Amino acid sequence: MSRFTFKQFHINQNSCAMKVGTDGILLGAWADVKHCKNILDMGCGTGLLALMLAQRTEENCQIQAVELDPIAAKQAQENINNSVWKNRIQLTQVDIQHFLQTTEQTFDLIVANPPYFEQGIACKNEERELARYTKQSHLNWLEWAATRLSENGRISFVLPYEAGKTLTKSTALFCIKQTNVITKIGKTPQRMLLTFAKQPEVLMQDQLVIYDADNQYTEAFIELTKDFYLKF
């Protein structure tokens, strides 16, 4: 699908290696945006997360999107320009580590749907390999993000379930919210939505099931995503 239409914006994705997927939509709808004035989207791809978060936040919230791949960055910029939030979203085409090392800005919320295979069979094209595979671990991404996080800020990731478990055990940051994502009732979790903070809080844990036993969307999934999906 070269174009994905949401209730308040469109995503053109014919030039992007990684298309709009459930992981990104879940993160964009789930991340806590209360009191956010500055948000960072690490590795923005099509611009999906930046646009979802712009829809969910107040007019005084500014969003910085960063994307390394020039082709994806160009299409993300087009998607941003076609939205009503183009004046609130700034996109920079640069390596995320370099960006974080050179910016003086701190962020109240940092989000990422990071590359999720750290090793494996090579992808068929360079852009898709760049989007899916990483020589840097998820812990690297989290530690980089923490350097520009405001004192009471949050970092939210979506990861494969086992990678999420590993990350929570590896970081010095505090995991304050964890939602295990189950594709269909009765199955084991496949994804994990995580929020980290600098200060300790009581961990909130729950689960989200996408499909019920009859292969219908659950009420919880509909409630979470209804502001975005046309079908809801």
UniProtKB/Swiss-Prot annotation:
GO terms for molecular function: nucleic acid binding; tRNA (adenine-N6)-methyltransferase activity. It catalyses: adenosine(37) in tRNA1(Val) + S-adenosyl-L-methionine = N(6)-methyladenosine(37) in tRNA1(Val) + S-adenosyl-L-homocysteine + H(+). GO terms for cellular component: cytoplasm. It is found in: Cytoplasm. The keyword ATP-binding does not apply. The keyword Disulfide bond does not apply. Keywords: Cytoplasm, Methyltransferase, S-adenosyl-L-methionine, Transferase, tRNA processing. One of its GO terms (biological process) is methylation. Belongs to the methyltransferase superfamily. tRNA (adenine-N(6)-)-methyltransferase family. Specifically methylates the adenine in position 37 of tRNA(1)(Val) (anticodon cmo5UAC). This is tRNA1(Val) (adenine(37)-N6)-methyltransferase. It comes from Haemophilus influenzae (strain ATCC 51907 / DSM 11121 / KW20 / Rd).
